[in-house]
Amino acid sequence: VRIAVAGGGAAGFFGAISAATHDSSAEIVLFEATHKPLHKVRISGGGRCNVTHHCFDPVELAKGYPRGYQELLGPFHRFQPKDTIAWFEKQGVRLKTEEDGRIFPVTDQSSTVVDCLLNAAKALRVQVRLGARVKSIQAAVPAEDAPQFEIELQDGMRQPFDRVLLATGSSPHGHRLAQALGHTIVPCVPSLFTFKVSDSRLEGLAGISFEKVKLTLTDKNKNRLEQTGDLLITHWGLSGPAVLKLSAWGARMLQQCGYQAELAVNLLPDFSAEKLYQDLLTYKEQNGKKRVHKEPVFPVPGRYWSRIAQYVGIAQEAIWANITNDAMNALVLELTRGRFAVSGKGIFKEEFVTCGGVSLKEVDFKTMQSKISPGLYFAGEILDIDGITGGFNFQSAWTTGWIAGESMASRE
């Protein structure tokens, strides 16, 4: 059996490794257009490579995918983070789990993961061709036992193959190859980005973070999205897990409104505005001589507390005894419904992800085989699947790659 893999990223390599593992007699050729295989693996997670996420319940895991959660349920019952960890550890790559659930190699170096995949492919006799761009894939009408695909490379070389795995990531060229074989491409838009916000309340406070904040994003058509999680002030606006989750779930909505929207921030979602107001009244009665700016009444960073006090018009030297009810109401409003104008998207350097790709309706997720062109398989980001940040995008690449490889090897 001759198997071609187009794309030398996480999904392509893992698909090739899986096919070779399940059928040692198969001839497997991996074509990578550049001279840098596994480039995203190398640069992700700030160069540490966030291999997967510490979530071993397939149903819970699937909830980390704005696009693909339904389709990935079955595959995750067959190959999930536990299997990813077991595979890497068997290859000698030890992994560790961080507090937020992200899993990294103990070396904290993505090169450990890159080398592991390159060595595994080599040991299994996968032929890796670098600088080999697949120009076209022709599906032949297969005679008995005849190869059913002809792959033409950019240099004009043509080769016959029985099965083809498309794992070209978010590359438009890969989408064109899929389209030429009859597939529908869901238009791509960015996912996982930070929010650009220019606001006096944030100026000079980059690096300050808040735990367990509730964010509500509203566009001009009154579409609303909510997320909870940690929030981080940056030099250009807002970031952190809560913002990144909003950007993923709202990828299409935000693209349609030109990344202009209103963000309401509730820093204390566990308390009602009424309760906070009563607490301020009590505090005022007991601490009349204290300066308002001196220390926060609630668990928010001191510098931010002072900033919002200034924002609502409370003078630097003002003491609690002189604070009006209106000023206290304004403080509560800032803590529970601070409104910010999102004016654009920033770059999240840890992960680069798009939403969009090959329509999931056209793929059989039991095998990752095309429902349109038999013998054609898909894995990774070429599909209209994307996850939130934290190792989810690599996990879908490992899972779909592994299943595609197994299916290509065992298909009669």
Model feature map: region roles:
Residues T21, K36, D57-V59, H77, ...:
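Residue-level recognition of phosphate/Mg2+-coordinating polar/acidic sites
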Residues A4-A6, F31, V134, R158-S171, ...:
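Short hydrophobic core segments
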